[in-house]
UniProtKB/Swiss-Prot annotation:
Phenotype when changing residue 649 to S: Complete loss of proteolytic activity of HC-pro
Species: Tobacco etch virus (TEV)
Protein family: Belongs to the potyviridae P3N-PIPO polyprotein family.
Lineage: Viruses, Riboviria, Orthornavirae, Pisuviricota, Stelpaviricetes
The EC number(s) this enzyme carries: 3.4.21.-, 3.4.22.45
Protein name in the entry: P3N-PIPO polyprotein
Length: 1016
């Protein structure tokens, strides 16, 4: 018996006929069988199953067939196939339903009919008790079916597949996710469809983002289709990142595809598979990218993609661009370059003009002006690279290149000649008349450099017009004040410092908060201060030395005694010699007192002396009126204290200025002082130089004009000013300077200010000692040609110091010093040669004057001529400043004496000058006496030897002429006339006989030597 099947598997038949012996013949694959074959197979099957087959004499009924259960199963399958192609009633478009039905039918047919490569073709039933021969019937059926269906083929070779264990696969996943997270890479999860994910930074942390459809311009109801395995893999990858809670308000444009794990967002939101993928927001609620929404919601909701950001930027940009487009363009605008290149050029210009990390970053908006206006080399280098990029890669944008070039040129317009601006302020800063005010205004405008505006240029042009009209109209008026009515009391009220009254700059204890200023103040502490270790004691810091002397600090009082008597002794301090108020204590301009630049007095006009200033630790003490203010220093080490280096105590003034500087300007302020101001000032500068530095800082940082200064003590004996720090002063009796703010200190800058104190050093050299030593050196070198030559080579202007005494000038003229100077300086340095000629002419006139008063008047007449030659000095050295100081004093003394004489007053300074001349002459005569003594000794030794030779060579009795010559020579040599007792030894032998003495007694060698020694 044989049976043909369309989709029946051989295994089913094997189960049915499990106990029988079968012979199976492979047949063709039924996947490609057509409908006719299937129909014929069905009819054959039904004929076998429903009709009894007669084999010989016996009938075989349906119940007797061994494959009756198989018939029932095949019948049900055939019934299903019969109705397989029928169309179901569905809603929707006809064409779409038809296409879907055809596709589904093909899939189900292929799934139904596709079986294994072999089916049962022939079944052999062994003989039973009923001997039935079914061979013929089965062969007929098989022959009819195999003509179309039988196709023999070799069975496929099964390939063995190797599978990784679950633990190894997990390790591979873990390593892959670690690499993706560290390198911010893109990962693709592939199943039936691929899902892409990327890693990027979001709100300060690294997060996982999935690629969704709306990011590529597609608006679908389901933004991300993902199967379960991909969701599990994506969740496993998301677990590698920190599960931080995300603020709902921070989810905006650019957060599309953000994968949030359950717990990182509010519990009220919907999750699936333990995570939430951001799509956008609809009616204030976030939408998951995997959720299915309606078409209306899909097109009305706000998607949080980066493309939305670009649209939000470009659409307003395009709208405003068209709105501001200029009228009257002479040509028709066409697209000549691509929009992409225009965007690239716009990005280059943005980074060149306003460098930032994001155009929406507010912090970049605040810091960018400082970067653009600054002069950092990194900023200029970056802008130069961008300009080179424009030239090389974008030559079709010449307007962008020209714009950036002009910007860099404008930025490089910086005025570096600070000395000229300061000199202008020193020369005419105190004059309030035209044209001096115009010159000062032009100087300040030019100092601005690249910060100039159009209004500044117009103002400068106006001032230059006024200068051109009034440049030659210079006048100077000076009046002498009287100290009898001078009063300069200090205020008992404390100065109001706005910087210390702002609550934002004070802590909970009311102390000043340095902020960024304290961080940048380290440039002062490290470079110009010395650390004090309290563990080592304070003894070595008590004596504060300077070149002129020393004073004692009160730092030793930090170690206090519990004995009240000892404490009372410490309060008294150690006083110096106290000086009264004099001209050295005042400052005048245009005949009026400049009170801030004068010493403080009491109500009766007497000087107010300093008392003991108590020490403190780690403080900056400011304020001169009322109670001082104590600010905590921004120390580097809480256990250390700091004291200014010797010669740099003026750094406490700059520390006080830093209090009023803005925090954003503190870095430039401290660097400018460290790199520019301090190298110019050096150690122990003059007060005028310190005031000039403060004036320069006030131009760049106007807030420092209101800054309070530390206390300043004046030591008139040593011509020194002491800027006090927190360690006070144990030495008392100094005068006190009244100035309290920076604007008052700047008054010392003006050259028209008449004050001795502006030349005082904030620490420094003793100028009086230096001047006296230079004069002594000049006197010593008059009769030492080698020493004079060395002085003329190293310090040529030292010869001007000779005008302090007419005797020194005459001695230098007689010794040939001026002639030696002329030979040395001609023709290379005509200025010095002219100066030597002037001094030589003055010395010639002094030799003709008999009276000392006449000699002084001649020197005063030549003082102005000498000063004019000194102003144009070609060498800068120490002797030049000393010479200018002495000549200036001569001129000032002459003018004051003249004013007194015109007023009817008697001038008593002549006696002082006579006494000074006698003092100098004593030293000069002592030097000359030593020189004469040496000359006499050398002369006497020479004549002694000559006379001894003559006494032996000639006979005095026979050679009378030679005797007379001998006596004449001795008389001239020893300057002793023969008629005197000293000349008795020179008389003739005849004279000695009359006196009763023999010639041997007179002219023996021994007696002659004694007489010669007596004459010497």
């Amino acid at each position: 018996m044989a049976l043909i099947f369309g989709t029946v598997n051989a295994n089913i038949l094997k189960e049915v006929f499990g106990g029988a012996r079968m012979a199976c013949v492979t047949s063709a694959h039924m996947a490609g069988a057509n409908g006719s074959i299937l129909k014929k197979a069905e009819e054959t099957s039904r004929a076998i199953m429903h009709k009894p087959v007669i084999f010989g004499e016996d009938y075989i009924t349906e119940a007797d067939l061994p494959y009756t259960p198989l018939h029932l199963e095949v019948d049900a399958e055939m019934e299903r196939m019969y109705y397989l192609g029928r169309r179901a009633l569905t809603h929707g478009k006809r064409r779409k339903v038809s296409v879907n039905n055809k596709r589904n039918r093909r899939r189900k047919v292929a799934k139904t009919y596709v079986g294994r490569d072999s089916i049962v073709e022939k079944i052999v039933v062994p003989h039973t008790e009923r001997k039935v021969d079914t061979t013929a019937a089965v062969e007929d059926i098989c022959n009819e079916a195999t003509t179309q269906l039988v196709h023999n083929s070799m069975p496929k070779r099964k390939k063995q597949k190797n599978f990784l264990p679950a633990t190894s696969l997990s390790n591979v996943y873990a390593q892959t996710w670690s690499i993706v997270r560290k390198r911010h890479m893109q990962v693709e999860i592939i199943s039936k469809k691929s899902v892409r994910a990327r890693v990027k930074r979001f709100e300060g942390s690294v997060q996982l983002f999935a690629s969704v459809r709306h990011m590529y311009g597609e608006r679908k109801r389901v933004d991300l289709r993902i199967d379960n395995w991909q969701q599990e893999t994506l969740l496993d990858l998301a677990k590698r990142f920190k599960n931080e809670r995300v603020d709902q308000s921070k989810l905006t444009f650019g957060s599309s595809g953000l994968v949030l794990r359950q717990g990182s967002y509010g519990p009220a939101h919907w999750y699936r598979h333990g995570m939430f993928i951001v799509r956008g927001r609809s009616d204030g609620m976030l939408v998951d990218a995997r959720a299915k929404v309606t078409f209306a919601v899909c097109h009305s909701m706000t998607h949080y993609s980066d493309k939305s950001i670009s649209e939000a930027f470009f659409i307003p940009y395009s709208k405003k661009f068209l709105e501001l487009r200029p009228d009257g363009i002479s040509h028709e605008c066409t697209r000549g370059v691509s929009v992409e290149r225009c965007g690239e050029v716009a990005a280059i210009l943005t980074q060149a003009l306003s460098p930032c990390g994001k155009i929406t970053c507010k912090r970049c908006m605040v810091e960018t002006p400082d970067i653009v206006e600054g002069e950092s080399g990194e900023s200029v280098t970056n802008q130069g690279k961008l300009l080179a990029m424009l030239k090389e890669q974008y030559p079709d944008f010449p307007m962008a290149e020209k714009l950036l070039t002009r910007f860099l040129q404008q930025k490089s317009l910086v005025n570096t000649n600070l000395t000229a601006c300061v000199s202008v302020k020193q020369l005419i800063g105190d004059r309030k008349q035209a044209p001096f005010t115009h010159v000062l205004a032009v100087s300040e405008i030019l100092f601005k450099g690249n910060k100039l505006t159009g209004a500044d240029l117009e103002e400068a042009s106006t001032h230059m017009l006024e200068i051109a009209r009034f440049l030659n109209n210079r006048t100077e008026n000076m009046r002498i004040g009287h100290l009898g009515s001078f009063r300069n009391k200090i205020s008992s009220k404390a100065h109001v410092n706005n910087a210390l009254m702002c609550d934002n700059q004070l802590d909970q204890n009311g102390n000043f908060i340095w902020g960024l200023r304290g961080a940048h103040a380290k440039r002062f502490l490290k470079g110009f201060f010395t650390e004090i270790d309290p563990n080592e004691g304070y003894d070595k810091y008590v004596i504060r030395k300077h070149i002129r002397g020393s004073r004692k600090l009160a730092i030793g009082n930090l170690i206090m005694s519990t004995d009240f008597q000892t404490l009372r002794q410490q309060i008294q301090g150690e006083t110096i010699e106290r000086k009264e108020i004099g001209n050295h204590c005042i400052s005048m301009r245009n005949g009026n007192y400049v009170y801030p630049c004068c010493c403080v007095t009491l109500e009766d006009g007497k000087a107010q002396y300093s008392d003991l200033k108590h020490p403190t630790k780690r403080h900056l003490v400011i304020g001169n009126s009322g109670d001082s203010k104590y600010l905590d220093l921004p120390v580097l080490n809480e256990e250390k204290m700091y004291i200014a280096n010797e010669g740099y105590c003026y750094m406490n003034i700059f520390f006080a200025l830093l209090v009023n500087v803005k925090e954003e300007d503190a870095k430039d302020f401290t660097k400018f002082i460290r790199d520019t101001i301090v190298p110019k000032l050096g150690a122990w500068p003059t007060m005028q130089d310190v005031a000039t530095a403060c004036y320069l800082l006030s131009i760049l940082y106007p807030d420092v004009l209101r800054a309070e200064l530390p206390r300043i003590l004046v030591d008139h004996d040593n011509k020194t000013m002491h800027v006090l720090d927190s360690y006070g002063s144990r030495t008392t009796g100094y005068h006190m300077l009244k100035m309290n703010t920076t604007s008052q200190l700047i008054e010392f800058v003006h050259s028209g200010l008449e004050s001795e104190m502006k030349t005082y050093n904030v620490g420094g050299m003793n100028r009086d000692v230096v001047t006296q030593g230079a004069i002594e050196m000049l006197i010593k070198s008059i009769y030492k040609p080698h020493l004079m030559k060395q002085l003329l080579e190293e310090e040529p202007y030292i010869i001007v110091l000779a005008i302090v005494s007419p005797s020194i000038l005459i001695a230098m003229y007689n010794s040939g010093t001026f002639e030696q100077a002329l030979q040395m300086w001609l023709p290379n340095t005509m200025r010095l040669a002219n100066l030597a000629a002037i001094l030589s002419a003055l010395a010639q006139k002094l030799t003709l004057a008999d009276l000392f008063v006449q000699q002084r008047n001649l020197i005063n007449e030549y003082a102005q001529v000498i000063l004019d030659n000194l102003i144009d000095g070609v060498r800068v050295n120490h002797s030049l400043s000393l010479a200018m100081e002495i000549v200036t004093i001569k001129l000032a003394t002459q003018e004051m004496d003249m004013a007194l004489r015109e007023g009817g007053y008697a001038v008593t300074s002549e006696k002082v000058h006579e006494m000074l001349e006698k003092k100098l002459c004593k030293g000069f005569e002592g030097c000359m006496g030593r020189i004469n003594l040496v000359g006499k000794i050398l002369r006497n030794q020479a004549f002694k030897k000559a006379l001894e030779i003559w006494a032996k060579a000639f006979n005095h009795e026979k050679h009378r002429r030679l005797r007379r010559t001998y006596r004449l020579v001795c008389e001239i040599a020893f300057q002793v006339p023969l008629g005197t007792p000293e000349g008795n030894h020179l008389k003739s032998r005849k004279w000695w006989r009359k006196k009763g003495k023999s010639s041997e007694e007179c002219h023996d060698k021994r007696g002659f030597s004694q007489n010669l020694q007596h004459a010497s």
